[in-house]
């Protein structure tokens, strides 16, 4: 159990972090006494700040300035957050109403990051559900010409993928119908990974008049949708990163590059598996070099207990952690409600 002195020093640190998040200006002992009810003398505050600095939680950037939190200080602050202030009823209604206006899954997710970027004043990202975990709802086969087909794959997550298939020989309308029925019989309710074997068997056993066409269609589906599923991100609010303080502005190009390349964020969001937990990576805790001057707050979204993907925000290390955690969690929860039709 922490001693009274340790508890007081944490309160001093909490006050420094809160003030710095609000002002982005170094915090001095005089300002702490004026702004916070710490109920101790200025000498005690200065001594506590000295100990916190020695322990690596705060740093004095210039001899005549106050202190600013270090990443270690932010980490202790975040780890000590137990009670997240809930959003107001008006905020919750506004979030749900905005998300319910989405016409499909991708539109709902696009709205979710627009909302998150506005609520947090950070860059917001969401990962579209990967085809690895999606189940096939329907496969539409459209004849574009006698020797060209369009395959439209629709999953239970609402994702739609389209692929063109060039044929070696013309296909009649009734053959297109047979092809569609066979594909749906093999794919319906299966994950695309599980469907790979079924597609290969389907090619071997298809009627002779459409066997070569079935082989081509199955090959396209297996090669592009099973073996190489395309993960995608939706990004909103990147311009928020350009409004940082002078001290952090130099790192903006690297962070923007990480967001634009998508690979870094896809890797991070792909590791999100928990619908009920918000993860915070601060500065050097981020594996990728491009994000080591930023903080990333992520959680999972989904429905019926299944995680479909990750969403979150990217911002400076001096972000409003309690508010950001609350808003990321709330938006993810309401995305799940909309997807579940609640």
Swiss-Prot record:
Q: Which domain of life is it from?
A: Bacteria
Disulfide connectivity for this sequence is none
Against InterPro entries, the record matches this protein to: GAF-like_dom_sf, HrcA, HrcA_C, WH-like_DNA-bd_sf, WH_DNA-bd_sf, WHTH_transcript_rep_HrcA_IDD
Keyword set, alphabetical order? Repressor, Stress response, Transcription, Transcription regulation
Tell me the organism. Corynebacterium efficiens (strain DSM 44549 / YS-314 / AJ 12310 / JCM 11189 / NBRC 100395)
Pfam families attached to this UniProt entry: HrcA
One GO BP: negative regulation of DNA-templated transcription
Which family would the database say this protein is a member of? Answer: Belongs to the HrcA family.
Q: What is this protein called?
A: Heat-inducible transcription repressor HrcA
Q: Which GO terms describe its molecular function?
A: DNA binding
Described by its record, this protein's role is as follows: Negative regulator of class I heat shock genes (grpE-dnaK-dnaJ and groELS operons). Prevents heat-shock induction of these operons.
Its taxonomic placement starts with: Bacteria, Bacillati, Actinomycetota, Actinomycetes, Mycobacteriales
């Amino acid at each position: 159990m922490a001693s009274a002195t340790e508890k007081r020093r944490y309160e001093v640190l909490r006050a420094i972090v809160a003030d710095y998040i609000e002002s982005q200006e170094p915090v001095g002992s005089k300002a702490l006494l004026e702004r916070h009810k710490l109920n101790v003398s200025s000498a005690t505050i200065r001594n506590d700040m000295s100990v916190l600095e020695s322990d690596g939680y705060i740093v004095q950037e210039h001899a005549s300035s106050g202190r600013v939190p270090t990443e270690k200080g932010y980490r202790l602050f975040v780890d000590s957050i137990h009670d997240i202030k809930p959003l107001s009823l008006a905020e919750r209604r506004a979030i749900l109403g905005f998300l319910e206006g989405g016409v499909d899954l991708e539109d709902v997710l696009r709205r979710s990051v627009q909302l998150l970027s506005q609520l947090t004043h950070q860059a917001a990202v969401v990962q579209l559900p990967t085809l690895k975990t999606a189940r096939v709802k329907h496969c539409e086969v459209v004849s574009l010409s006698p020797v060209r087909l369009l395959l439209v794959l629709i999953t239970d997550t609402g994702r739609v993928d389209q692929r063109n298939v060039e044929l070696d020989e013309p296909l009649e309308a009734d053959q297109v119908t047979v092809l569609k029925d066979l594909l749906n019989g093999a794919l319906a309710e299966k994950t695309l990974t599980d469907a790979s074997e079924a597609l290969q068997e389907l090619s071997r056993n298809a009627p002779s008049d459409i066997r070569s066409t079935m082989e081509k269609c199955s090959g396209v589906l297996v090669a592009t949708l099973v073996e190489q599923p395309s993960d995608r991100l939706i990004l909103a609010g990147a311009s928020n990163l350009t409004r940082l303080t002078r001290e952090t502005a130099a790192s903006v190009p690297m962070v923007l590059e990480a967001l634009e390349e998508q690979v870094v964020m896809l890797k991070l969001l792909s590791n999100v598996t928990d619908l009920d937990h918000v993860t915070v990576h601060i500065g050097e805790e981020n594996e990728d070099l491009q994000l080591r001057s930023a903080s990333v707050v992520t959680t999972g979204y989904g429905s019926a207990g299944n995680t479909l993907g990750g969403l979150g925000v990217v911002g400076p290390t001096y972000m409003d952690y309690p508010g950001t955690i609350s808003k990321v969690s709330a938006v993810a929860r309401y995305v799940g409600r909309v997807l579940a039709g609640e």
